[in-house]
Amino acid sequence: MRMYYSRLKLASVLGVCLLGLLLCLPNGMRKPFPSIPWRQIHLGLDLRGGSYLLMQVDLKSLTHDRLQTLAENTRDTLLKSQLGYQNINVDADKNTVSFQPRDAAEADTDVATLDKLPRVVPNEFSVKKQDDGTIALVLSADAIKARAREAVTQSIEIVRRRIDGTGAVDPEITRQGDDRIVVELPGISDPERIKALLGTTAKMTFRLVDSNPLHATYPPPGVSLVPMANPAEGGPLPVFDHVDVDGTDLTNAGAVIDQQTGEWAVSFSFDSVGTRAFSSVTQTNVGKRFAIVLDNKVIEAPVIRTPITGGNGQITGGFDAQKATDLALMLRAGALPAPLSVVEQRSIGPSLGADSIRAGILSLGVGFLLVVVFMVLFYGRFGWYADIALLANLVLMVAILSLFEATLTLPGMAGMLLTLGMAVDANILINERIREEVARGRTPLAAMQTGFERATSTIVDSNATAFLAHVMLFVFGTGPVRGFALTITIGIATTLFTTLLLSRMLMARWYARTRPASLPV
């Protein structure tokens, strides 16, 4: 026990405790104090109130879009290879693109040519000659699943960028299952703007308009009738399916006021790839209409007056300030790979959150008070030392959560309460071991030394096992499970510190001052 008499060790342990207390203070202050690090615990949805959105990724739309792209690539490849075809069909139910060769003798050549098409993932599709003579490109089930996983992961990142752009504080965005995303928005009781932002795919393309007036009624293959975003501007336009410039090549977008009209507009700029493509199409199609299509609706279709080579442009579509800002935000964040739909929405009022906070603090306070009384009644002075260690444990837990600006939820508060129980177990084990050594007739110093040594290995083993288990919960869990696991994991670390260092040091310093003939246990 003499090694714990060191003033340096005493100062180190007390310094950690004082630092923890300092980090806790901002949680009880409304305004920053210059000499105190200003980091606070953020309250989760169940404590602060706010909105909960459960959104589903439309994976069928994702597959359909890929089939449409595959059909377009098939058409272009056959034309370039001078291979005739009839009726390219897309069957989303069977995940196939099929066509009838113009000449049955060219079927094998068709298969060999189309088999060289680029694949997004390995073995994405196979090219087969059917019994009826048609050629079919079939998406594989594994490729569809891989694309779905990638789409959900990509959607989460884009959702996060869009929400961050609105200034929302502490949003929580997690995956649920194979095709769902949970969005928690603390402090936002009316998430209508967020829903509108997330419900828009924001897939922008730039395509030429077919100038043949007959095609406005009967569009040929490769041309689609695309409705106007503003129906007052006219009926659907015949737009070529071929995408001349893709919105993924955008590098920036912002809401501006048009200097000529005084109306709100969205300015944009392309990267080098988009700049070259935009320059090429505007140079070779002067006098033609160029449609800006957002989510399969034409925002506007201006006539190309002169080549645009600078890689910058502007979209005007009768926007107000909010719509222009939101569109620019969505373009900066990127297009969603597939549409999102809200399948569940809940709102938690701030009064309910305040009730949860009061209930959580009350449970922690009552639990801590009962522990204090129990330890003092059963272990006397050493019980008081255990209570001091428990208080320091709670302070250090709050300090670490504040340092990392973690989000505290009701399950997290339950984890803190459970941690106090685990810390009590450790202190009880130490005191019982000391009692056993006293009963065997050992001197006070020997009883304390041996009692701690016998208890330490058990405490470390049990806490190490619990630590690993809760780390796994944090890594693989979601939502409330992660909050619970986080506080338990932090609590285990602080429990080992306060139990094996602080409480032992308090006992050792007391013994060094008093040299008692017997121990108060």
UniProtKB/Swiss-Prot annotation:
GO cellular component: plasma membrane
Topological relation to the membrane, as annotated: Multi-pass membrane protein
GO aspect biological process, one term: protein transport by the Sec complex
Entries under Pfam families matching the protein: SecD_1st, SecD_SecF_C, SecDF_P1_head
Keywords, ordered alphabetically: Cell inner membrane, Cell membrane, Membrane, Protein transport, Translocation, Transmembrane, Transmembrane helix, Transport
Classification via HAMAP family: SecD_B
PANTHER family tied to this protein: PROTEIN TRANSLOCASE SUBUNIT SECD, PROTEIN-EXPORT MEMBRANE PROTEIN SEC
Functional description taken from the UniProt entry: Part of the Sec protein translocase complex. Interacts with the SecYEG preprotein conducting channel. SecDF uses the proton motive force (PMF) to complete protein translocation after the ATP-dependent function of SecA.
Assembly and oligomerization: Forms a complex with SecF. Part of the essential Sec protein translocation apparatus which comprises SecA, SecYEG and auxiliary proteins SecDF-YajC and YidC.
Record's protein name: Protein translocase subunit SecD
